[in-house]
Amino acid sequence: MAGKALRQTLLRMAGACDCASLEFHDGRVIAVDNGRRLPIDLTHLPLDPHGYVLTREITFDPPTSPLDENGQGNPYAVYGFGAHLAEVQVDVELGTVRVLRITAAHDVGRAINPTLIEGQVQGGAAQGLGMALMEEFTPGKGENLHDYLIPTVGDIPPVETILIEKCSSVGPFGAKGIGEQAVIPTAPAILNGIHDAIGIRVRKVPATPDRVRAAILALGSPGG
């Protein structure tokens, strides 16, 4: 959209019709209009405050619909989907949980920059691990961050990222977002891994050793 608007600006500067074509040679733009070649020398144009010769800004508001009386609708234009699988190891005597591996599958639309997306997923998995096992803040309690634990590089397991490309009709080049989407599934995946390993359900995060031990004792079978 911005490119089309910039094209129209160039055609107007050259005095060419809308159906003319544009060619670029040695810092000059040439509008070709019914055999006429109409040059525009960009080197003689003043720069804007950002150092550009010509710019155009376009705003695109993707189509959405409000929720109806039943709470149904499309308040967002694009929806991403993701699922995480966590392989964990639980020490039933100490209540400690170690995450061995995370597999993360995400529908990202068109993966324009796969390396950047993988980094986003890995970072989200790290944040989710902290949410699941370490990080806890109680409003009104605690005078500093001394006891607020966060994951270190030694806590982060290998993360296998699976990118699913189901393109969006409104995203740029078919892309979708991958922000909180990488954080949200991690903690549930880890808690499900704990349940699969020893049969307990931890209902409150973080799953600290004392909470895991309490759940084991409540189950009545420390060996799982």
Predicted regions and their residues:
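C-terminal catalytic domains of large/alpha subunits in multi-subunit enzymes
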Residues: M1-G224
